[in-house]
Curated annotation (Swiss-Prot):
Pathway: Metabolic intermediate biosynthesis; chorismate biosynthesis; chorismate from D-erythrose 4-phosphate and phosphoenolpyruvate: step 2/7. This is 3-dehydroquinate synthase. PANTHER family: 3-DEHYDROQUINATE SYNTHASE, 3-DEHYDROQUINATE SYNTHASE, CHLOROPLASTIC. NAD(+) binds at T134, T135, K147, K156. Disulfide bonds: none annotated. Catalyzes the conversion of 3-deoxy-D-arabino-heptulosonate 7-phosphate (DAHP) to dehydroquinate (DHQ). It is found in: Cytoplasm. InterPro entries: Dehydroquinate_synthase (IPR050071), DHQ_synth_AroB (IPR016037), DHQ_synth_fam (IPR030963), DHQS/DOIS_N (IPR030960), DHQS_C (IPR056179). It is an enzyme of class 4 (lyase). It comes from the Bacteria. It catalyses: 7-phospho-2-dehydro-3-deoxy-D-arabino-heptonate = 3-dehydroquinate + phosphate. Its cofactor is Co(2+); Zn(2+); NAD(+). GO terms for biological process: amino acid biosynthetic process; aromatic amino acid family biosynthetic process; chorismate biosynthetic process.
Amino acid sequence: MNKRKILVPLGEKSYEVTLEAGILNNISEELLKIGITKKRKILVISNEEISNLYGKKFLNNLKDNKFQAKMFLIKAGESYKNLKTLSEIYDVAFEFGLDRNSIIIALGGGIVGDVSGFAAATWLRGIEYIQIPTTLLSMVDSSVGGKTGVNHPKGKNLIGAFNQPKAVFIDPETLKSLPKREFSAGMAEVIKYGVIRDKELFEYLEIDKNKNELINLKNEYLIKIINSSIKTKSHVVSQDEHENGVRAILNYGHSFGHVIENLCGYGKFLHGEAISIGMNIAGKIAIEKGLWSKEELERQRVLLESYDLPTEIPKINKEDVLTILMGDKKVRDGKMRFILPKEIGAVDIYDDVEDSLFLKFFS
């Protein structure tokens, strides 16, 4: 399988995403290629499930090639993406003697990547880190773009930093052991890219043959959609690293998705499932504002559901919805900003959406 390389062009902070089936088996070689010498200490952060699948083999690969490496396992689940977990990482970093020339490797899904990246941003005022995402959602979304952080009891990702990785390595082979529900959750983000910027990708995902090959985890098809998704994200991030403008379009479906995650309790819906419902709500608002057609909303709904994603809006208290939305990071000068579709392949940012326009979708 051919190796794909995607540049994320951010001046001095530019880096490459390397996408290849089986790349985890040659990780030591890949690290040497990007200048990670064997003198540098490596702290690999993962979780128990990933460690059992790939982590031990990964760590042994590093040690067999004379890298000074240690692995620390954090607990899996959104409820552990917090300051306590971060503090535990700092303790291990101190005991291991992680200095400014050391490096952190995040081996796992989005939670591992977010926490590891923030630990790297804050340990000794910042050390380098590498993302090795093992879920579809983290491959196409959280591993690229430099958003790192932890949750606060009042909301998701309220504590964090923009911290670009030194490199990202993606091995689609890791998706073979991903639970089907987790794979579907990742497809929500892939479909999102189709709606916001890539009509061709959206249409590719609608074709039954492609759908079947993706569900059966054929590398060639996985690489195609991961490559397309990352190219879109890279292009947007390179224009607006710190989300002061156009980067906000990557949050399509996320404002309402975060509301659903928060009010239904973290864990009821996977992140991608909540985003799927959020995209359906955003699509309904777009119809109310006359931005796109019922046919386009229906195409989005059918595509989401064909990858086993939920679109039905759960019963949630309207007042709670407003409270959560006003605490959203996308609020500017007291105004909520919504990412709404104009057509398949194009969205825009709107701050003139009346509360009544979206509250009617909640009971």
